[in-house]
A protein has these predicted regions:
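RNA-interacting cores
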Residues: 1-250
Length: 250
């Protein structure tokens, strides 16, 4: 089971909180966990937490979205985040005014959700800086191949029992995807001593696929708001929301 939590933060007046502070929030979170849990997370190649920080114009609020991508981390982290009242960062304490907890979902539920759509158009909105690594270099445009590879890798990490490993099916899926519209801007995500080339904005993808492959693609899209897209989703990058047709993911 995976789960999404959203913490509404209230920075003190005059304090600007950049999106890169997501990395500091993650450091605070790791410090709150039992030592054995934190050590286990650091040893894993793909961390079971994807999170990001963004300002919501609709809600006029700063929101920290935290996705817990396996049952062990969900049981450890969810009670901690639902009870926190303030996050004491060195730069400034951040009061938590609200915590919204989405129901936990399974891979089977996401797959069923994918089957409930016959629309072939989806919009992905990248709320925090997103990037890919290709041939050892940063790629700052969401090509269809890179989108699919990223979503599949994150899915396989979260749901190894439902791993997508059929190369022929994935190739057919890739060949049926087409970015038909985009509204993107380049940016940089400061991380330690590096400023990672990245992008934010939105893309619209059309899928010309046989029904079984369209269901698979829609399941991956429904997972995107949890697993994120691209690299360093554990450090605040790649925060994504998605709408399929006129309806969003669960």
């Amino acid at each position: 089971m995976i789960q999404q939590l959203q913490l509404v933060l209230a920075p003190p007046t005059g304090v600007r909180v950049p999106q890169a502070w997501a990395y500091r929030l993650y450091g605070w979170l790791m410090a709150q966990l039992p030592a054995d849990v934190g050590d286990a997370l650091h040893l894993q190649g793909e961390h079971p937490i994807a999170h990001f920080l963004h300002f919501s114009p609709e809600k006029q609020a700063l929101i920290w979205t935290v996705n817990l991508l396996n049952e062990t981390v969900r049981q450890s982290v969810s009670p901690l985040l639902t009870s926190v009242k303030e996050i004491p960062l060195h730069e400034s304490p951040l009061p938590v005014t609200e915590v919204h907890v989405s129901p936990a979902v399974s891979a089977a539920e996401l797959i069923r959700f994918g089957r409930s759509f016959d629309e072939n158009r989806a919009k992905l909105v990248f709320l925090s800086p997103c990037a890919f690594k290709q041939s050892g270099r940063y790629a700052i445009f969401p090509q269809e191949t890179l989108l699919l590879q990223s979503l599949t890798a994150h899915w396989n990490t979260a749901f190894p029992e439902y791993a997508l490993t059929d190369d022929d099916a994935l190739l057919a899926l890739q060949q049926g995807l087409h970015i038909v519209d985009y509204n993107l801007r380049t940016t940089r995500y400061p991380l330690k001593e590096t400023r990672i080339p990245s992008f934010q904005g939105s893309v619209t993808v059309e899928a010309h696929l046989a029904p079984p492959l369209l269901e698979l693609w829609n399941a991956l899209l429904s997972f995107a708001p949890y697993g994120g897209v691209g690299i360093k989703t554990t450090l605040g990058m790649g925060g994504t929301v998605c709408s399929i047709g006129r309806t969003g993911a669960p």
